[in-house]
Structure formats: structure tokens, C-alpha cells
């Protein structure tokens, strides 16, 4: 059920008269994952010949005509052998998690004309000022962000020594039907259980920070256009939503769609980060506005138009609730206790 639902979305327009010389043989590593599903759909719709490489692929997620192969990139030279066997015109790598991965990708794809390495906006660290540009360089806080920055540094070194002109794409958070939706206080879907139960929504700093969610179909459409642009080489480009949504509005939309009252309770983000056992997501990402300068994306992918929006995010949230995919109950209980703990602190002797 979820496999089929995950493929639904706005129709991706295909150019049925696409010249043969514009058709590429594209290898997508990680093509069956959260982002990869949208990428593969878009490439297939654009009439490219797509091969998906993954460690544990899900054939049901792949459009008809897309071929799947196995890749365990930790095996010595496995990636290099796969590229040599498939002879792709282009590679989109969604599985570069650290510097070692990036080095393997660049070595394996040394003879490939077009290479796209997907990084993350977390590589830029907390977005204390917005819009965030490609030149923003605040130190990342999380291990994930630090590793993604190392990916970028490895690719930049290859630019500098002339061994690669891979395109670096700094991707924001991506959602789709069938994938989970994080809340503001934790990288987890427990906020959905609170909404379904009609419990108060616990937000940080009134939920005023704007969250940035890009639909996987939109991510795929943009990456497909970037891949087709011969000028999109040797640069770093942001790919994120043009319609960031305040956390408060996101929570309110879901509560109202469920017919539940919306009674938000706010706690200070800095204080909450000190209380939670795992506060990396709040400290690095969700307490800050996720607003990105997409000017370079506009220049490199001028025909790309984002189709997702708040209504589609709400649709995904409702689907997750119906499926019972509502996060970690213990974590949810910890978050629900925060307002009472804050009240106790504020009324303690000697505190105002």
C-alpha cells in the first residue's frame, strides 16, 4: 500500500519528442530512498534511461522501465566496477555520507561526464541569519552536518586539482507520501500522536521559526533539470522549498484537518535544548528560520517550478496518522512534560 502511494503526486511532464541526443543513461545511487523516489520519477519522465543502485532496493517503488542493481559501496572497488559495467553518461549520488564516501564516488566516476553529489543544508550549520546563501559557512553542530561538510570539502578539493567538475547540491529537508515527518522539538513524528489525541502542541519559541520542506517530486524535477544543464558543473547550489512554513502553522493545519483543537504551548528553544536528551535537531535546525537564497538554482534550472506546498504536507501527516506511524511514544511523553517542567522552574523559590 505505502509503496504504491509513495509514487503518487502531480504528474511529471515528459517531453515525448525529446531528441535522442538529449537522452542520458543515468545511474542513481540511493534511488529507492526518500529523495531517490522523486529523482527517479523525474528522470524517467524526462525520457532518460535510469538505473538505480542501492543496497536494499524496493522494486515496487521504481517506475516501469527503470532497472535496479545492487551496490554495497563499502565493498572494495564495487562502485568502480558498477560504473565500468553500466557506462553511464551521468551519475546522481544520494549516498555520500562522509568524506570517504565522496572520495569513493569521485574515483569511481572519474570518467563520467556529469556527476551530481547531493549534500545537505546542515553542512552550513545553524541558520542564524537568512536567507542562507551558498557562501554561508557557520560550523555545523551535528555529526551528520559535520560529515556532509566533509563531503563538500572533498568535492571542492577535486575541483581545485582539476580531477572533477561534479555539481554539489545542498538539499533541504524532503518529504513525500510514505515517508516520516519530523516535529520541531525532535527529529521524530511523535508530534503527530499529540495532534491525533488533541493534546496541546508543544512548540519552541512560539513555533515562529520557518521550516523548509520540499516534496521529493520537486527535488527530483530540479535535479533532473540541473543534470541536463551543461553549465551546472563545479559549483555548489541550494535546493530547497520556496515556501517555508512556520512550525506553528504546520501544527495548526494538521490539528484542524483532524478536527482537533489547537492549543499550543511554547517553551524557550534554548531551554528545551538543554532539557532534551537528544537536542541536535532543535539546536542546529528547527529553532532557526530555514530560508534559502535560491537565485543560483533559478539561473541553472530556469524551467523548474515547485508544485508542493502546505496542503501536500498536511496530506502526508494525515496518512502517517492513519497508518499509526506517529513516532516514539517515550520521546513524545518527554516533550509533553516540558511545559510543566518549565512552570516548575519558573515558580521555584528565588526565581521569577
From Swiss-Prot:
Reaction(s) the record says it catalyses: 2'-dehydrokanamycin A + NADPH + H(+) = kanamycin A + NADP(+)
EC number: 1.1.1.355
Pathway: Antibiotic biosynthesis; kanamycin biosynthesis
Pfam families, per database record: Epimerase
Keyword vocabulary terms for this entry: Antibiotic biosynthesis, NADP, Oxidoreductase
Record's GO cellular component terms: cytoplasm
Biological function: Mediates the conversion of 2'-dehydrokanamycin A into kanamycin A.
Protein name: 2'-dehydrokanamycin reductase
Species for this entry: Streptomyces kanamyceticus
Amino acid at each position: 500500500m505505502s509503496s504504491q502511494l509513495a509514487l503518487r503526486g502531480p504528474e511529471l511532464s515528459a517531453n515525448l519528442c525529446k531528441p535522442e541526443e538529449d537522452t542520458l543513461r543515468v545511474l542513481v545511487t540511493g534511488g529507492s530512498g526518500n529523495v531517490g523516489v522523486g529523482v527517479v520519477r523525474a528522470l524517467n519522465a524526462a525520457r532518460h534511461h535510469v538505473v538505480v543502485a542501492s543496497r536494499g532496493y524496493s522494486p515496487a517503488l521504481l517506475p516501469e522501465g527503470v532497472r535496479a542493481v545492487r551496490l554495497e559501496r563499502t565493498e572494495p572497488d564495487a562502485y568502480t566496477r558498477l560504473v565500468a559495467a553500466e557506462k553511464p553518461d551521468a551519475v546522481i549520488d544520494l549516498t555520500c555520507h562522509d568524506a570517504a564516501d565522496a572520495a569513493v564516488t569521485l574515483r569511481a566516476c572519474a570518467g563520467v561526464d556529469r556527476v551530481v553529489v547531493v549534500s545537505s543544508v546542515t553542512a552550513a550549520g545553524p541558520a542564524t541569519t537568512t536567507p542562507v546563501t551558498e557562501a554561508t559557512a557557520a560550523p555545523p553542530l551535528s555529526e551528520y552536518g559535520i560529515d556532509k561538510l566533509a563531503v563538500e570539502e572533498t568535492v571542492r578539493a577535486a575541483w581545485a586539482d582539476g580531477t572533477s567538475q561534479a555539481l554539489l547540491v545542498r538539499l533541504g529537508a524532503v518529504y513525500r507520501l510514505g515517508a516520516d515527518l519530523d516535529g520541531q522539538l525532535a527529529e521524530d513524528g511523535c508530534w503527530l500522536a499529540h495532534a491525533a489525541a488533541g493534546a496541546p502542541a508543544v512548540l519552541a519559541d512560539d513555533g515562529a521559526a520557518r521550516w523548509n520542506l520540499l516534496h521529493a517530486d520537486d527535488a527530483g524535477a530540479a535535479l533532473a533539470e540541473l543534470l541536463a544543464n551543461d553549465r551546472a558543473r563545479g559549483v555548489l547550489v541550494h535546493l530547497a522549498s520556496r515556501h517555508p512554513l512556520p512550525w506553528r502553522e504546520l501544527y495548526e493545519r494538521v490539528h484542524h484537518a483532524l478536527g482537533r483543537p489547537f492549543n499550543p504551548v511554547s517553551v524557550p528553544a534554548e531551554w528545551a535544548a538543554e532539557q532534551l536528551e537528544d537536542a541536535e535537531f532543535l539546536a542546529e535546525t528547527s529553532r532557526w528560520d530555514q530560508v534559502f537564497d535560491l537565485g543560483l538554482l533559478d539561473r541553472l534550472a530556469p524551467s523548474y517550478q515547485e508544485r508542493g506546498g502546505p496542503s501536500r504536507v498536511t496530506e502526508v501527516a494525515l496518512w502517517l496518522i492513519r497508518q499509526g506511524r506517529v513516532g516514539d511514544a517515550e520521546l513524545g511523553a518527554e516533550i509533553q512534560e516540558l511545559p510543566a517542567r518549565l512552570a516548575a522552574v519558573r515558580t521555584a523559590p528565588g526565581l521569577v
